[in-house]
Amino acid sequence: MNYSELLKKLTNLDKDYLVRVIGKTKFNRKIIAVERIVDESFSTAIFLSSIHARENITTDLLLEMVENKLFDKIDKFNLSFIVMANPDGVELQSGGLDRFPKRWQKKLVSMNGGSKDFSMWKANAKGVDLNNNFDARWGTNKHSLVPSSQGFVGTKVFSEKESKAISKYTKKMNPFITISYHTKGEEIYFNFFQDEKRLVRDELIAKRFASSTGYIIRNVEKSSSGGYKDWCVQKLKIPALTLELGSDELSHPISNENLSSIFEKNKSIAFDLEYAYNVFEKSR
């Protein structure tokens, strides 16, 4: 789903869902959170999708979940869906150079190694990999040294409008868990240098998600840094999961013909969240 399609979809949301603009990109596209607020005093489960441009089927999944009313019976906590964390990147990946000013197009081609094919692009329109730009051991692992299609951590922590807006909003919403959807591999990541007590708590939750989805838990702690999940674990000290959607046999970008099978494996999400909420509350 591209940015224009997203805006159109959001006009037809159920009345229980609110659309909030939490920030804007370099090229003035809206960073949008869709909220289901049960009670302002409650904590929140936050979902993040399309932080990597070529992984925009994750936006389709979130909206499919909302449209299928998977969350309608939740009454203990609020829900927030950051439905497209990287709208500039998604527009570039899906629509190409024409979606950007002429003055910027030459820079984009240069960042893309001279190619005008942006189908594999992950970064934002400044060539920063947003999922390497958060304040969690930032810049400590192998990464690109210059703006590019993927892997460039930025010039400093939170150098990008997107990561700044998302971090500010996340703290404001008092989350008890965050779920980041990526592609691909049908894997779950949850650990990032937690203390033993939090590690036990977070592993319980990860195992529940693994059981319901059939995904495999992987330990990528030593190879991860600067990610949204990493930041939530390290700085907010809450459970945070990354779910890699879609079989590893699929090719990037994953086409929408695979959406129904991805949805089927993730349709127990409301029950998983309720379990996570109970585990979190008991650990406090």
Where are these regions (language model features)?
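Short glycine- and acidic-rich boundary segments immediately preceding or forming the N-terminal edge
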Residues: 1-34
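A residue-level signal for conserved active-site and pocket-lining positions in enzyme catalytic cores
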Residues: 28, 130, 243
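Short beta-strand-to-loop junctions in surface cap/lid or active-site-entrance loops
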Residues: 32-42, 50
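Active-site/substrate-binding loop(s) of hydrolase catalytic cores
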Residues: 42, 56-57, 71-194, 198, ...
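Conserved beta-strand elements of the Class I
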Residues: 44-46, 241
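Short alpha-beta junction capping motif
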Residues: 46-48, 53-54
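…and closely analogous acidic/polar surface helices at protein-protein or active-site interfaces
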Residues: 61-72
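Metallocarboxypeptidase
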Residues: 140-284
